[in-house]
Amino acid sequence: MNPLISSASVIAAGLAVGLASIGPGVGQGTAAGQAVEGIARQPEAEGKIRGTLLLSLAFMEALTIYGLVVALALLFANPFV
């Protein structure tokens, strides 16, 4: 295996996980903050807000998992070899 391709795959895998987690991390923080603010304003809507928050957090976390899958594919099933 070419060492240049091998090292580029490791760097790309690290970037895939790192960059794939930036957006969802910011989005999850914003969503959680807005949910807490909404619950503080309307405590009677806490159940509905919490359910919507958990669903949206799961969708955001899926983006990070996709980045992890790409990184694992680059490390263990390298298509460039």
Curated annotation (Swiss-Prot):
The record marks E61 as: Reversibly protonated during proton transport. Keywords: ATP synthesis, CF(0), Chloroplast, Hydrogen ion transport, Ion transport, Lipid-binding, Membrane, Plastid, Thylakoid, Transmembrane, Transmembrane helix, Transport. Signal peptide: none annotated. It is found in: Plastid, Chloroplast thylakoid membrane. It is a multi-pass membrane protein. The chain crosses the membrane at residues 3-23, 57-77. GO terms for molecular function: lipid binding; proton-transporting ATP synthase activity, rotational mechanism. PROSITE patterns: ATPASE_C (PS00605). One of its GO terms (cellular component) is chloroplast thylakoid membrane. Pfam families: ATP-synt_C. F-type ATPases have 2 components, F(1) - the catalytic core - and F(0) - the membrane proton channel. F(1) has five subunits: alpha(3), beta(3), gamma(1), delta(1), epsilon(1). F(0) has four main subunits: a(1), b(1), b'(1) and c(10-14). The alpha and beta chains form an alternating ring which encloses part of the gamma chain. F(1) is attached to F(0) by a central stalk formed by the gamma and epsilon chains, while a peripheral stalk is formed by the delta, b and b' chains. F(1)F(0) ATP synthase produces ATP from ADP in the presence of a proton or sodium gradient. F-type ATPases consist of two structural domains, F(1) containing the extramembraneous catalytic core and F(0) containing the membrane proton channel, linked together by a central stalk and a peripheral stalk. During catalysis, ATP synthesis in the catalytic domain of F(1) is coupled via a rotary mechanism of the central stalk subunits to proton translocation. Key component of the F(0) channel; it plays a direct role in translocation across the membrane. A homomeric c-ring of between 10-14 subunits forms the central stalk rotor element with the F(1) delta and epsilon subunits. In plastids the F-type ATPase is also known as CF(1)CF(0). HAMAP family: ATP_synth_c_bact. Belongs to the ATPase C chain family. This is ATP synthase subunit c, chloroplastic. The lineage of its organism: Eukaryota, Viridiplantae, Streptophyta, Embryophyta, Tracheophyta.
